[in-house]
Amino acid sequence: RLYAIIAIAFVVVAIGLVVWNSNIIQRGTTAVTVEGESYSAAEVSYYYHNAYNSIVNSNYVSLYGIDKNTALSQQSLNDTAKMMLGVSEDMTWDAYFRDAAKKSLIQLTMLKKGAAEKGLTFDDDMQKEIDSTLETFSTYAKKAGYSTSAYLKLMYGNNMTMSTFKSILKDTVLASHYQQDYIDSLTYTDEEVETYYNEHKNNFDVADYEYIYFKGTADST
């Protein structure tokens, strides 16, 4: 399938994004606005923590060098982390996760707009997906020794509530269905695929490798 090639173009479009500041933002306050769509601090926090959790739960967390006992705004990506994540500039982990949250919200907004234009609406099958997710989340909360509401705050920040979580899931499920419908609707010839490949070889002709990192000193001579 051509999923890797057909990256949804509108994910990276230039759109009006009002970034939240670093002060404490109350739960109902608009933290980010994307194309006229307002997102609360809790919604921003969800995508921030999603990005954070994906890093700290990855197999390469030891290479990223995140210190969980130090504020993310006080520690920067090391050279290995920048190389692995494709980051070219120096930045703190807090800035990296904020940027990841912004990109997720941009993508979500554009997919929601696409769904609305197509007339795709939330249906019973989508609700079943959400119900399954909520059931799984509740199971993990119990295994960890938390109530569902406490586990939500642990995973996604103190502003997160069950109603906000359900709203986020509804948006993401609808966006996901539209994205898949869009991909499935695309048609292309072998010649078009070949042309695209030839124009973007550097994106596909890459080596697969693993990192082995260790510290040591040279043998004395």
Give, region by region, the residue ranges found by the protein language model:
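Short extracytoplasmic
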Residues: 34-63
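Alpha-helical membrane-embedding segments
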Residues: 62-71
